[in-house]
Amino acid sequence: MNRRRKLLIPLLFCGAMLTACDDKSAENAAAMTPEVGVVTLSPGSVNVLSELPGRTVPYEVAEIRPQVGGIIIKRNFIEGDKVNQGDSLYQIDPAPLQAELNSAKGSLAKALSTASNARITFNRQASLLKTNYVSRQDYDTARTQLNEAEANVTVAKAAVEQATINLQYANVTSPITGVSGKSSVTVGALVTANQADSLVTVQRLDPIYVDLTQSVQDFLRMKEEVASGQIKQVQGSTPVQLNLENGKRYGQTGTLKFSDPTVDETTGSVTLRAIFPNPNGDLLPGMYVTALVDEGSRQNVLLVPQEGVTHNAQGKATALILDKDDVVQLREIEASKAIGDQWVVTSGLQAGDRVIVSGLQRIRPGIKARAISSSQENASTESKQ
């Protein structure tokens, strides 16, 4: 009996030692399993913004040209200043035009006198015709002379009206409210009616247009996504934000007005036009800008933090995920668009997948890893709501 006890005690001691070693090995193995931060994907909706290049265009442009010829005797504006509709810009010497008006009025008076005399003669001939004191031919001649005299009165009246208009045209006015440009003529210059060169250009800059360029591919993609319900657009005006050439955001929000139905054959693009308030004149014609157009709300979107997306040697987007057995798997994905610090993934991943976003340098496909909650998971969830 004592002998059995002596043999049993060493055996129990060895067994305990082996168990302790196994537990220690398990702890060491667990400690060696790399920890990775993951984000669990869930579908949501997100506003889609298209970044488009563009240039500013005046809302209205008036190239001022004289409608009568003559000598410029006065300029009534300061270059670069605001002018209102109807303001006088130039004064053309009115003396020759006034003389033409006076001559036209004299011709009208003469025509009226001739017509009055012809009417008296015609009335007399009409009375005598009833008593056969004049021939029918004399009566017809008197009637013809009266008609010609009345026609001459009409022509003379038109000449007076035209001369009056020409005299008014001697005062060259602005047809719009806007900012005047550089004058191309000075006092003393001879100008002609409807000449090719403008005297000055007036541009209305508040509001102001921005012409944007969008590729046909993006234009068709957006139409297809709206038609299929992938993008839900709010009825009404489409808001547009603007980034200036210095990188700063323009303080006013614009709206999309229309899209040109014609494709530019040289660039393969379409033109979109937006309109912006410009009360302070910060936007000038010809400025290069970048617009952010709100395409609408994309439904059932999977957003993946940019840290979780890499590109292989072929340039294709990939992501590492943890499967249900905590084994690292490599997925090839389609990351169609970047929104902020996240990618919109359209294929290769699904809701519920755990995408690895941190600890990537410690893992490779096929090994086990231990998931820990990522701080980006909350941010990702908030962006979808």
From Swiss-Prot:
Pfam families: CusB_dom_1, HlyD_D23. Keywords: Antibiotic resistance, Cell inner membrane, Cell membrane, Lipoprotein, Membrane, Palmitate, Signal, Transport. SUPFAM superfamilies: HlyD-like secretion proteins. A lipid is attached at C21 (N-palmitoyl cysteine). GO terms for biological process: bile acid and bile salt transport; response to antibiotic; response to toxic substance. It is found in: Cell inner membrane. It is a lipid-anchor. One of its GO terms (molecular function) is transmembrane transporter activity. GO terms for cellular component: plasma membrane. Residues 1-20 form the signal peptide. InterPro entries: CusB-like_dom_1, CusB_D23, MFP_Efflux, RND_pump_MFP. A lipid is attached at C21 (S-diacylglycerol cysteine). The keyword Transmembrane helix does not apply. Homotrimer. Part of the tripartite efflux system MdtEF-TolC, which is composed of an inner membrane transporter, MdtF, a membrane fusion protein, MdtE, and an outer membrane component, TolC. The complex forms a large protein conduit and can translocate molecules across both the inner and outer membranes. Part of the tripartite efflux system MdtEF-TolC, which confers resistance to various compounds. Belongs to the membrane fusion protein (MFP) (TC 8.A.1) family. This is Multidrug resistance protein MdtE. The lineage of its organism: Bacteria, Pseudomonadati, Pseudomonadota, Gammaproteobacteria, Enterobacterales.
